[in-house]
């Protein structure tokens, strides 16, 4: 799966008229089956699991997989009749409820488009959403900022652990993937966290085939990553195949940005331009979505999932390497944060 991509080998004779990139995506069935198995394992092994939902593309994929794992899919006629305005995008595609709530840590610095999408998606599904507010942690004094515009991304670990403790969650399902970053590459699918919420890389449990050790002591919990074995290309192929809705900022749009250290920094109320910055209005999209203070877009004309698949086949820089300022503080910045309890 992580071997060098052989485009010719992926082409299928009957696919040439199906899409612009004509990539054979039949391997997605195996990835989907594995992810659904992991989700059902979580539901069966833990008493109080929850699904982390940031409205990012990976969590949207995991949420879609969870619906496939635990809900009944509606037929086409029911989907069309359930849509009030005739748009399939507003109609639910599954009936039933998930066996766990959704969780979002809101830093207060999220992109407005992402929060609007989150609220619309939750309302459409009728699921329970638990929101941990970083500003509540600030009021409690457990989070203290050096200045009002400081990045809150690293501080959300505190709010996450407080939310876990308050609701007594014993497993959080996340959308992390091994191809994103080297610290995530060595993390297990079922990632054990100690009573302090910390990850100990040297104490990871063996995972033999589909056998997982999910035993925990009081106060401990797990993080489970159903799409750990997926790549960015797999995610976009699956989004295209399944017609998964995403926040609009994942697709090309015009936005004011400034150039800093090789990155395009979006101009927002929490990332204003500095005196020597030259503000440009470019056509961009976001490859990954996080805090406004640390997430950068890339120049792109891609308007659809198919366009993004074509782009992804050609990129040479990882999505986090090209877009995240928080990963550039040191070589081990992600591992350090994960040891402290980060996602």
Residue spans of the language-model regions?
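Nucleotide-activated chemistry modules centered on ATP-dependent adenylation/adenylyltransferase
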Residues: 2-343
